[in-house]
A protein has these predicted regions:
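Helix-loop-helix
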Residues: 49-53, 144, 148-165, 176, ...
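Transmembrane helix-loop-helix hairpins at lipid-water interfaces of multipass membrane proteins
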Residues: 10, 16-73, 77, 150-155, ...
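Hydrophobic alpha-helical transmembrane segments of ABC transporter permease domains
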Residues: 21, 25, 29-33, 58, ...
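ABC-type nucleotide-binding domain
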Residues: 325-583
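An intracellular "coupling" helix at the cytosolic face of ABC transporter transmembrane type-1 domains
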Residues: 11-14, 99-103, 119-132, 136-140, ...
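A short amphipathic helical element positioned immediately N-terminal to and/or at the very start
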Residues: 1-11, 113
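Short intracellular "coupling" helices and adjacent cytoplasmic loop segments at the cytosolic face
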Residues: 47-48, 83, 91-115, 119-121, ...
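Juxtamembrane helix-loop junctions of ABC transporter transmembrane domains
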Residues: 21-22, 29-42, 63-110, 114, ...
Length: 583
């Protein structure tokens, strides 16, 4: 895990190497100060030698200045290395997430990925900075101070050893269980972020159903769970300071009592006893810094583990060994396809699906909620892979294509329309970033979006808020259809993408498709039969199985589900949910 993380230091390796070097040298300078002070007392003050006082006083000042300079440099390079390291981690995670399939995203959840890229990376950044400085400075302090203590005090140095053993035992008893608690803490962060994200993104629904109280209660429960875990962890960590103070006071009492006897018997000088007090504080401060570092490491270890999970996750859509670089045409074939979601119920949502679509043909797909209409079409641009069977586009298995090539030729308007902050032109050019304004206007007219765009004061330069919150549902759908058309794809998939559009506009869009893009294979998922009845063929899905396939007229004669829904819709307000099974 550590090797994986450190590999992302990149251009900040130099700063990461210089930081511990300067921190170690700073610690050495600090350790020299008590010995120099001992010379000032023994050679200067007790003997009344002003020259010795000035000489060793100047040396003390120079050592302190050098230590200060080294500390500043260590701090500068530590900040540079840790900040750059965190940036590289976020970049690497973000880049890897871009290659995830929908199944990979389902595994972590959106809120979980956000937590890992923000809170978890910040924890690792802080821990890395502390490791670079304290975890180098403190051990150097500890080793050199112990060495100097043994050199000066001899048997008195056993006091230091007892203190070190005591504190190491206490720290070990605290840290081991605390690590597991922090692992649960960050899982609770995921739940908290999910609650916030869901509430904010659906705030209009929350308010319209007067569910503020329920959402507040749900958020409070998530906060309380996080609070309880943190209190549990901090309660254990709270033993750290009392243990440290016990060691400090115990060492001071023991050293004062035994040290005074050694001075009276002439075994050590007053200056050396003073130096021993300085070294014992050095040792205990080093242990305190290490304990703080261990606390930070305990928190960040769980975060580091979660970050590595994201970095190690590989897409479950493996690339083809010899990828096909061109889609010949828009012909589509499903051959005995079965599919299930890896992180779902484990039951197949599509069962033994077999049918084909000719290039340029229009296929309508209808079925009840949970009949797997969206799941079916998501296999065409390879957003998921089939569990068994084969999906072909242009006569080639979709798994044999270069994924970018395939998706450039299969343009899909998802059921959940997404617009990004930027102008209307910016959003349309997601389909083709090099498209001219004239091309954008042309596809907007095909999608019947031009009529409302022209009513905006800034027309195509009108600013769209994040998520398209300042346009209506129907307007959003027409903009996303126009965006898909701008790619000039061989296959166009509309996943219930005209549900918020009135029937007259829906008819205009379908007419424009027939007249302007006859060579493009079109797949239209809809609840309204009027949206698909002009299609060359209509596929009826029921509980993940094909219940019927034919023209509008053929299905009216042969398919019971289609007949009943057609009759209910022509008589008023019928839909497929009355026939379609629940998934």
């Amino acid at each position: 895990m550590i090797k994986k993380l450190v590999s992302h230091l990149g251009e900040y390796k130099r700063a990461a190497v210089l930081t511990p070097l300067f921190a170690a040298l700073e610690a050495v300078m600090d350790v020299l100060l008590p010995t120099i002070m001992a010379f000032i007392i023994d050679q200067g003050i007790e003997k009344g030698d002003m020259n010795a006082i000035l000489k060793y006083g100047l040396l003390t000042f120079l050592v302190a200045v050098v230590a200060l300079a080294l500390g500043v440099l260590a701090g500068k390079y530590a900040a540079e290395a840790s900040t750059g390291f965190a940036g590289n981690l976020r970049d690497a995670m973000y880049e890897n997430i871009q290659h995830y399939s929908f199944s990979n995203i389902d595994k972590f959840s959106t809120a979980g990925l956000v937590t890992r890229m923000t809170t978890d990376v910040t924890n690792v950044q802080n821990a890395f900075q502390m490791i670079e400085r304290m975890c180098v400075r403190a051990p150097v302090h500890l080793v050199f101070a112990l060495f100097m203590g043994v050199m000066i005090g001899g048997p008195l140095s056993l006091i230091f050893v007892v203190a070190v053993v005591f504190l190491v035992a206490v720290l070990a008893g605290i840290m081991v269980p605390t690590f597991h608690i922090f692992d649960r803490v960050f899982k609770n962060y995921d739940a908290l972020n999910a609650s916030v994200q869901e509430n904010v993104s659906a705030i209009r629904v929350v308010k319209s159903f007067v569910r503020e109280g329920f959402e507040n209660e749900k958020y409070t429960k998530a906060c309380q769970s996080l609070y309880d875990q943190f209190v549990n962890a901090e309660s254990r960590l709270s033993f750290n300071n009392p243990a440290m103070l016990t060691a400090v006071y115990g060492c001071n009492i023991a050293l004062s009592w035994l040290g005074a006897k050694y001075v009276l018997h002439g075994a050590i000088t007053t200056g050396q006893l003073n130096a021993l007090f300085g070294y014992i504080m050095n040792i205990l401060m080093a242990l305190m810094m290490l304990s703080m570092a261990f606390v930070m490491i305990s928190m960040s270890a769980a975060s580091a583990k979660r970050i590595v999970e994201v970095l190690d996750e590989t897409t479950d859509l493996p690339p083809a060994k010899q990828p096909v670089q061109q889609v010949k045409d828009g012909g589509i074939e499903f051959e005995h396809v079965t599919f299930k979601y890896k992180h779902g119920s484990g039951q197949p949502v599509l069962n033994d699906i077999t049918f084909s679509i000719k290039p340029g043909e229009t296929l309508g797909i209808i079925g009840g909620t949970g009949s797997a209409k969206s799941s079916l079409v998501q296999l065409i641009p390879r957003l998921y892979d089939a569990e068994s069977g084969t999906v072909k586009v242009g006569g080639v298995d979709v798994r044999d294509y270069n994924l970018d090539v395939l998706r450039r030729e299969v343009s899909m308007v998802l059921q959940k329309n997404v617009l990004f902050s930027g102008t209307i032109l910016d959003n349309l050019r997601w389909g083709d970033e090099n498209a001219s304004e004239e091309e954008c206007i042309r596809v907007a007219k095909l999608a019947c979006a031009d009529e409302f765009i022209e009513r905006f004061p800034n027309k195509y330069n009108t600013w769209i808020e994040q998520g398209g919150s300042n346009v209506s549902g129907g307007q959003k759908q027409r903009l996303t259809i126009a965006r898909a058309l701008l790619r000039k794809p061989k296959v166009l998939i509309l996943d219930d993408s005209t549900s918020a559009v009135d029937t007259a506009t829906d008819a205009k869009i379908r007419k424009a498709f027939r007249e302007e893009i006859p060579g493009t294979t079109k797949i239209i998922i809809a609840q309204r039969i009027s949206s698909v009845q002009d299609a060359d063929r209509i596929l009826v899905l029921d509980n993940g199985k094909i219940d019927g396939l034919g023209t509008h007229e053929e299905l009216l004669k042969t398919n019971a589900i289609y007949q009943e829904v057609y009759n209910s819709q022509t008589q008023g307000s019928g839909d497929f949910d009355k026939q379609g099974g629940e998934q």
